[in-house]
UniProtKB/Swiss-Prot annotation:
Main localization category: membrane
Tagged with keyword Metal-binding: no
UniProt GO BP: response to chromate
Gene, per the UniProt record: chrA1
The name this protein goes by in its record: Chromate transport protein
Keywords from the named record: Cell inner membrane, Cell membrane, Chromate resistance, Membrane, Plasmid, Transmembrane, Transmembrane helix, Transport
Source species of the chain: Cupriavidus metallidurans (strain ATCC 43123 / DSM 2839 / NBRC 102507 / CH34) (Ralstonia metallidurans)
């Protein structure tokens, strides 16, 4: 009774035993994971299970599985949402908030430092050389991610394959991402697999696209209209990241490059490369993009706006997830959205490859990256990116001077 414990009765009626760890211990664990956790969302989720469920036994396997299911069901980067949910299990809103910040903060600070270096030294040969190699390797990495996601999530379902191929085509042709197609895909699968009564009676509603805000302004450190625009755009982007953080890439490209012209193609590919060489969630690349657009304020606004939907989509439904999370309509909706997101990722690989594969050496580097990742399953992306950077440092000066 001497140490206060948070209430532990869930909305679903189950009662957790008192936690065997302090909130400080949990926050420090996620601070360390955010600093050293390379390998992408699947690897990060695996680390959490290994450490928190198996080794430390702070979290039960049932709670972990519920968090993983919610992270797959709701919009938001999988690893960040799972971390937030695990913080919520015993320490509710305070735990979810502190864990979320601790998990994201290390990689955010890293991309800020890389953003400063990119702006400060971007015109120098060595910086151009690094990204010459890394940009090509990133194409190979994303291609393998798209392949694995397609194989795992689309499977043999003909309707999901239809949605997937439509989104690939739309992304390649328009070189942008139409947000409402994600929702339309989810509703289509929902209505097909688990149609509501009113639909079976022959009634149908129409769906309308929600346009993105118009582009405006030049870069300015404290340009409030620009910062507001950044906030609105990245909040929308954060709301359409299903499963893998890579799902945000085509959406960002459509807004940041094609519509708003905040960055050019090369800068955008470099931003994706930064996400690959830093630990923590891939989505943190938004901090790098925000820094290039509007300095430190832009980085802070972009990161906060992107992760706010992730946080809300985890904390708000958490008490009710046990009761409603396995409804056929919800599961069908998520399958549709996931197929659409993976199709957009695959289309983005093609779009970005046209910008990053500029000659025979970069084409070979991308192909070698794909071959290595297929051959050596445990080979980490940061190792590949580091090797590509070294190749770029050697090859770029020889080929361009």
């Amino acid at each position: 009774m001497n140490s206060p414990q948070p209430p532990d009765t869930t909305a679903a009626g189950s009662v957790h035993t008192a936690p065997t760890y302090t909130l400080r211990q949990l926050v420090m664990y996620f601070l360390r994971l955010g600093t050293l956790g390379f390998g992408g969302p699947v690897a990060l989720a695996g680390y959490m299970h290994r450490d928190l469920v198996e080794a430390k036994q702070w979290i039960t396997d049932a709670d972990y599985k519920e968090g993983l299911a919610l992270a797959q069901l709701a919009p938001g980067p999988l690893a960040a949402q799972l971390a937030i949910y695990l913080g919520y299990v015993h320490y509710r809103i305070v735990g979810a908030t502190l864990v979320g910040v601790a998990f994201v903060l290390p990689s955010f600070l890293m991309v800020l430092a890389l953003g400063w270096a990119y702006v400060r030294f971007g015109g120098l040969t060595w910086m151009q050389s690094v990204f010459y190699g890394v940009g090509a390797a990133v194409i190979g990495i994303i291609a393998i991610s798209a392949y694995k996601l397609t194989k795992k999530s689309v499977g043999n379902d003909k309707l999901l394959w239809f949605i997937y191929l439509v989104l690939v085509a739309v992304t390649v042709i328009t070189e942008s991402e139409v947000a409402w197609l994600f929702l339309a895909a989810g509703v289509l699968v929902w209505f097909w697999r688990a149609p509501p009564k009113w639909l079976r009676q022959g009634k149908m509603n129409a769906f309308a696209a929600t346009p993105l805000p118009a582009a405006s302004g030049m870069m300015s450190t404290l340009d409030w209209p620009l910062l507001s625009q950044i906030g609105v755009f990245f909040a929308k982007a954060g709301a359409f990241v299903f499963g893998s953080g890579l799902a945000i890439v085509p959406f960002l490209y459509g807004g940041v490059v094609t519509e708003y012209h905040w960055l050019n193609d090369k800068q955008f590919v470099d931003a994706v490369a930064v996400a690959m060489i830093t630990p923590g969630p891939v989505v943190i690349t938004v901090g790098f993009i925000g820094y290039l657009v509007a300095g430190l304020p832009g980085a802070c606004v972009a990161a906060a706006a992107t992760f706010l939907p992730c946080y809300l989509f985890t904390v708000l439904p958490a008490p009710y997830f046990k009761k409603y999370g396995k409804l056929p309509a919800i599961l069908a909706f998520v399958d549709g959205v996931t197929a659409a997101a993976i199709g957009a990722i695959t289309g983005a690989v093609i779009v970005l490859a046209k910008r990053s594969i500029v000659d025979i050496p970069t084409a070979l580097l991308a192909l070698v990256t794909v071959a290595l990742l297929l051959k050596f399953k445990k080979l980490s992306e940061p190792m590949i990116v580091a090797g590509a950077a070294l190749i770029g440092l050697v090859a770029y000066p020889l080929l361009h001077h």
